[in-house]
Curated annotation (Swiss-Prot):
Organism: Neisseria meningitidis serogroup C / serotype 2a (strain ATCC 700532 / DSM 15464 / FAM18)
Family (UniProt): Belongs to the bacterial ribosomal protein bL9 family.
Gene Ontology CC terms: ribonucleoprotein complex; ribosome
Record keywords: Ribonucleoprotein, Ribosomal protein, RNA-binding, rRNA-binding
Gene Ontology BP, a term: translation
Transmembrane segments: none
Entry keyword annotation includes Mitochondrion: no
SUPFAM superfamilies the record matches: L9 N-domain-like (SSF55658), Ribosomal protein L9 C-domain (SSF55653)
Protein name: Large ribosomal subunit protein bL9
Length: 150
């Protein structure tokens, strides 16, 4: 299905690009989320009329993400979890746990933004983690996983 992108989407394209995606991806995710519209003549004309408005909105979203990126870059977030004597955790530290720690530090984040390329953290230590606040704004933070004291 051919669609018009209403915002920049990583790995797909920029605002205004006409791209071909699988029908299910367009119908079930992109169109309902307001990230794209079908590439019909009427929608293309409507997009051209609203282009400046959409570009301004995207610039504002990116500027907000850059501000949050500057606050987050280089920060250390501590997460306490029960651990054995050998340093292995009982359970694991997931992206939801890290997002909750970031929010507790006073910076807006959701678990979908936290990138754990090697999966959940399963041992005590310090880990470099990326927080993708926007396609063009990725902050690198240090997550210190410590053994919880009771």
């Amino acid at each position: 299905m051919q669609i018009i992108l209403l915002e920049k989407i990583g790995g797909l394209g920029n605002l205004g690009d006409i791209v071909t995606v699988k029908n299910g991806y367009a119908r079930n995710f992109l169109i309902p989320a307001g990230k794209a519209k079908r590439a019909t003549e009427a929608n293309m004309k409507e997009f051209e009329v609203r282009r400046a408005e959409l570009e301004a909105k995207q610039a504002e979203i990116l500027a907000d993400a850059r501000v949050r990126q500057e606050k987050l870059d280089g920060q250390t977030v501590t997460v306490a979890q029960k651990a054995g004597v050998d340093g292995r955790l009982f359970g694991s530290v997931t992206n939801a746990d890290i997002a909750a720690a970031i929010v507790a530090a006073g910076i807006e984040a959701v678990k979908a933004n936290v990138r754990l390329p090697n999966g959940p953290l399963k041992a005590v230590g310090e880990y470099e983690v990326e927080v993708a606040l926007h396609t063009d704004a990725v902050a690198k933070i240090t997550v210190a996983v410590v053994a919880a004291t009771e």
